[in-house]
Amino acid sequence: MPNPFVCRVIASIFLLIFSQQIQAAELTIDVLDSTGSPIENAVVYAEPDNKSSIPAANAIIEQRGKQFNPLVSVVQAGTDVTFPNFDSVRHHVYSFSPAKTFELKLYSGVPTSPVKFDKAGTVVLGCNIHDYMVAFIHVVDTPYFAKTNKLGKAVLRDLPNGNYTLKAWHYALAKEKEIVEKQVLVKESQTIVMPLSLKPFMIPAKK
């Protein structure tokens, strides 16, 4: 006959897991410009009032075809990023951004160590050899983040119920340091529109 105490413990664990699943919601965010057109590659993220203990995951930004891939990345503060070079030529990756200043001098293949991005902010990447190579890393203080697709949509999943500051960023913001934000109470899944004002911005053409 099963031990009643063990049965109660198991039941409590299942109840806890089930209740957490019920309380988790998702936000669908539509990011639009001043004409109502969708914005691709916008970063959206939700900062909870109570700090999350979810650890940062690792990330990869490739160099392939003398371009960074992806153009835009979003990572949680504390993330280790690896910069593999798959080209037949060497690259010299660097950034002078206040959020992370670093350089990986001329190399091919995979660097021996990743770069840790431990401060929130925007990091602009370049190559000291190919000045048309550019990419952006937006470092955030939350595990709840996503990037918009061609339809301007992004989904933040598994958000515990509570109060959040929802923020949106894009590398072509009209006011470079003015991140758009909204206060959001998450109790159930919902769709939110985030308007952004962008300035003309041309990614350098590959030579």
Predicted regions and their residues:
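A short, Gly/Thr-enriched small/hydrophobic beta-strand-prone motif that recurs across taxa
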Residues: 23-34, 200-207
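A short, amphipathic beta-strand motif
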Residues: 27-33, 44, 83, 152-154
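Short, ordered, surface-exposed loop/turn motifs in non-cytosolic proteins
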Residues: 35-51, 55-56, 88, 131-136, ...
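A short, solvent-exposed beta-strand micro-motif common in secreted/extracellular proteins
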Residues: 44, 79-85, 162-173
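Short, acidic Ser/Thr/Gly-rich low-complexity loop/linker segments typical of extracellular
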Residues: 56-67, 71-75, 106, 144-151
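Structured interaction patches on ligand/partner-binding surfaces of diverse proteins
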Residues: 103, 108, 140-147, 171-193
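A glycine-anchored, Pro-Gly-centered beta-turn/N-cap motif
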Residues: 121, 160-163
